[in-house]
Amino acid sequence: MGEIGGNALDGIHARVRTAPLADQAAIAAVRQRDRLLTKPPGSLGRLEAIVEWLAAWQGKSPPVLESAAAVVFAGNHGVAKHGVSAYPAEVTAQMVANFEAGGAAINQIAKANGLKLSIVPIDLDRPTADIIIADAMSVQECAAAVNLGASVAAADLDLLCIGEMGIGNTTPASAILQALFGGPAHIWVGPGTGVERDALTNKIRAVESAVARVIGTDGTSPLEFLRRLGGREIAALVGAIIEARHRRIPVLIDGFVATAAAAVVHAIEPGAIDHCLIGHLSAEPAHRRAVQALGKTPILELNMRLGEASGAALAAGIVRSALAVHTGMATFAEAGVTDRQT
């Protein structure tokens, strides 16, 4: 995505609405080969659909996975000072250092699944404004974060897994989802890093206050919700999703916070996240509600709530297996196996 000048948010809207469509010829070619493989039709379930998805958005059959990556965006939040997380804000920078040293869960998962890992900290010494009383970002700050996220969608990637790190960021994610989909705050708020009882009540009140400040004002487009309620890492996730679509890169979305970013894009144009699959269903209670609102079915359900693109990176292993089956299996003719009677 080129640098967006002028009315930056309008430029981002336009970018979403001019996204390329799925390659129907590639889908048809995958289905044709699948019918010839030594198995009953449909017997590999979602693995077959995953290969069709890869082909549709890469625009080729067979699809490939020669260059796959995971990206973790990190940001800090002014609302964290209200005790909405079990951890202090300095943990964001400390975890970025841990990522860079190779000591986090995502480092191990990315390595195990053949993913190049990138960590993108965004102005950690400059938290967003406290969303209870002020807009999180200016238009320029939001657009800059979107552009930064877009820059990770390199043209040579075959698959992109995206996630985040940011103490307190399930609070802005919950606020975005409530603003987009409605309902009371408590159905969109969960424990995040492990808050409970009074701290959880405090988190719900923070989301209620933030959304009440925004709803009914002029700035209520999806990107305005992102700007006013979100965070830099969430905006970067939005940029990565949008640019990946234009570069025909299939995307695996991580958990609750990354899904909130996908929801922003979906709210602009529902088909604009068709190139995305949800890697896993988070243990964060509202994640199920969010993915249902997007019409998505997560690939995995492992009771995880870590973030860090960990669930998306694990799902990349399923995607690799699906493609290996599709490209490596013999056809009935090649194997000398009698096909089903018709």
Curated annotation (Swiss-Prot):
<dbReference type="InterPro" id="IPR036087">
    <property type="entry name" value="Nict_dMeBzImd_PRibTrfase_sf"/>
</dbReference>
<comment type="pathway">
    <text>Nucleoside biosynthesis; alpha-ribazole biosynthesis; alpha-ribazole from 5,6-dimethylbenzimidazole: step 1/2.</text>
</comment>
<dbReference type="GO" id="GO:0009236">
    <property type="term" value="P:cobalamin biosynthetic process"/>
</dbReference>
<keyword id="KW-0614">Plasmid</keyword>
<dbReference type="InterPro" id="IPR017846">
    <property type="entry name" value="Nict_dMeBzImd_PRibTrfase_bact"/>
</dbReference>
<keyword id="KW-0169">Cobalamin biosynthesis</keyword>
<dbReference type="Pfam" id="PF02277">
    <property type="entry name" value="DBI_PRT"/>
</dbReference>
<comment type="function">
    <text>Catalyzes the synthesis of alpha-ribazole-5'-phosphate from nicotinate mononucleotide (NAMN) and 5,6-dimethylbenzimidazole (DMB).</text>
</comment>
<keyword id="KW-0328">Glycosyltransferase</keyword>
<dbReference type="GO" id="GO:0008939">
    <property type="term" value="F:nicotinate-nucleotide-dimethylbenzimidazole phosphoribosyltransferase activity"/>
</dbReference>
<dbReference type="InterPro" id="IPR023195">
    <property type="entry name" value="Nict_dMeBzImd_PRibTrfase_N"/>
</dbReference>
<comment type="similarity">
    <text>Belongs to the CobT family.</text>
</comment>
<dbReference type="InterPro" id="IPR003200">
    <property type="entry name" value="Nict_dMeBzImd_PRibTrfase"/>
</dbReference>
<protein>
    <recommendedName>
        <fullName>Nicotinate-nucleotide--dimethylbenzimidazole phosphoribosyltransferase</fullName>
        <ecNumber>2.4.2.21</ecNumber>
    </recommendedName>
</protein>
<feature type="active site" description="Proton acceptor">
    <location>
        <position position="308"/>
    </location>
</feature>
<keyword id="KW-0808">Transferase</keyword>
